[in-house]
Amino acid sequence: MMLDQNGVQRTNKKLKNPLVLFFYPKDDTPGCTIEVCGFRDKYDLFKVLGAEVWGVSNGNSASHLSFANKNKLQYPLLCDTNDSLRKIFKVPKVLGLLDGRVTYVIDRKGFVRHIYRDLLNGPAHIKEAIRVLKELQNE
């Protein structure tokens, strides 16, 4: 379980839908803003595809709340302040310093069905998640 920007405890154990869990390096940075806004702009499509969307970085709830409000995000940002979720999902640090950018598509049974890694191309994460969710609908 992990808190989001509003102090709500989140766990995928209660979800009945697929989950797109995307790890991004830091709030209020140019590349991360492009990525989170990309997920925001396609949020209705994610809902049509039956998926939840959660973002994760090591920012605290105040940082996430400000970032979410500024960018009008409709989905939760999880506060992984001690990198515990990042470690569970084995999200790498680039050069041992910069938090990686990785997206996981988790099916409704809780299985990771796809992992997409690309530090520099945040928008590709959205396209890849949508592609995989469409494939899951055809199973």
Predicted feature descriptions by range:
Residues 1-139:
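Chalcogenol-based redox active-site neighborhoods
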